């Protein structure tokens, strides 16, 4: 039977870990499967996240263990250090397009169909807003034998024209709280946030690689604050 959130709802930290794996698999494939350090950075990044979280390494490990029991993630044993992959599409029994929409809803909170189409640009290219709405409707009408509904439309907030959607992977949604303080983000800012998020993830992957190389070679990495050769300690500027 596919994953049933009504029977085993995800915690916010589990949803963040799962959705981060889903995101990075598509947007930063060179860093996937993900190391624990890379995953921690991706979960806590300040761009493309609502809410922004500050998970600890222990919380990420606990979330991974719980998700593994639900068959939604698994550890890839083909690497020297542990790396993780998601199994959401198969575990939840949904098509690729629906998995993309649910991943975005887990990462960014409630969104309109138009916002989802824009935010999905680096994940999957939907032909139009109507196709996004069709998959959202399918998620809402999902039958009980398939695990029940996975998405729900929210009541329109005063002064808004478009309906927003929320996922149900963490259980029922508090529509009042979900509609509080909604402000649209300009498209240019969204693009910049995506680029910053990608750079943060790539930097975390590079740090993990350097750490592993230093361990293999028996080298202690120098702190970033150490003065450069030929420069006096202090402000580090010539002639100071």
From Swiss-Prot:
HAMAP family noted in UniProt: UPF0502
UniProt organism field: Verminephrobacter eiseniae (strain EF01-2)
Gene3D superfamilies xref list: Winged helix-like DNA-binding domain superfamily/Winged helix DNA-binding domain
Lineage: Bacteria, Pseudomonadati, Pseudomonadota, Betaproteobacteria, Burkholderiales
Entry superkingdom: Bacteria
Membership in a protein family: Belongs to the UPF0502 family.
Pfam families: DUF480
Record protein name field: UPF0502 protein Veis_2102
Record InterPro entries: DUF480 (IPR007432), WH-like_DNA-bd_sf (IPR036388), WH_DNA-bd_sf (IPR036390)
């Amino acid at each position: 039977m596919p994953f049933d959130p009504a029977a085993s709802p995800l915690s916010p930290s589990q949803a963040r870990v799962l959705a981060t794996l889903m995101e990075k698999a598509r947007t930063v494939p060179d860093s996937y499967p993900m190391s624990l350090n890379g995953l921690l950075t991706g979960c806590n990044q300040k761009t493309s996240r609502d809410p922004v979280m500050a998970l600890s390494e222990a919380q990420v490990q606990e979330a991974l263990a719980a998700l593994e029991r639900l068959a939604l993630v698994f550890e890839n044993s083909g690497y020297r250090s542990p790396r993780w992959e998601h199994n959401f599409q198969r575990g939840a029994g949904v098509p690729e397009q629906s998995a993309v929409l649910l991943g975005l809803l887990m990462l960014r909170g409630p969104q309109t169909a138009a916002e989802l189409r824009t935010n999905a640009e680096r994940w999957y290219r939907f032909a139009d807003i109507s196709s996004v709405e069709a998959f959202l409707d399918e998620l809402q009408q999902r039958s009980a034998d398939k695990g029940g509904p996975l998405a729900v439309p929210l009541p329109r907030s005063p002064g808004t024209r478009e309906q927003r959607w929320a996922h149900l992977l963490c259980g029922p949604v508090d529509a009042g709280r979900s509609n509080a303080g909604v402000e649209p983000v300009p498209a240019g800012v969204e693009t910049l946030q995506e680029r910053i998020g990608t750079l943060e993830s790539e930097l975390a992957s590079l740090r993990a690689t350097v750490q592993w190389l230093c361990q293999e070679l028996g080298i202690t990495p120098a702190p970033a604050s150490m003065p450069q050769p030929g420069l006096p300690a202090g402000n580090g500027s010539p002639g100071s």
